[in-house]
Amino acid sequence: MVQAGGDMYVAGRRGDRMWRLGIQNPRGPADSIFASLELSDATFSTSGDYERFFIKDGRRYHHIIDPDLGEPARGCRSVTIVSDRAIEADGLSTGVFVLGPAKGMALIEQLPQVEGVIVTAENQVLVSSGLKDRLTIISAPTDSRP
């Protein structure tokens, strides 16, 4: 297991089972997770609006910019991508975040060897078809912090 920032690579298995990784609750208490994911020989990358941000006049400003609007992308709170290539997972987590939930999930479903989990701005959890059997929702994402 190798971790760098929001990216992680897991090789092989943990004994006789896959590695179990948590997906952070974007508005939950620090270090809380809302779901766990079982993976083996894969890269896991998450982009979100909850790490680097500030709030001004009640509006959240974060580091993932929508190039069409010139301001922070607003449709997602977090995007987790699973792929066999780290550079692909990292780029796609940010790109899907900017595309938004519907277009982002459509892209994920079209790409081979790519799966994803999206938490929308309304805390809806979208899961790609290839992860449905490997993802466990522990609790619904919450709004317990700004």
Enumerate the language-model features and the residues they cover:
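Mature catalytic core of soluble alpha/beta enzymes
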Residues: 1-146
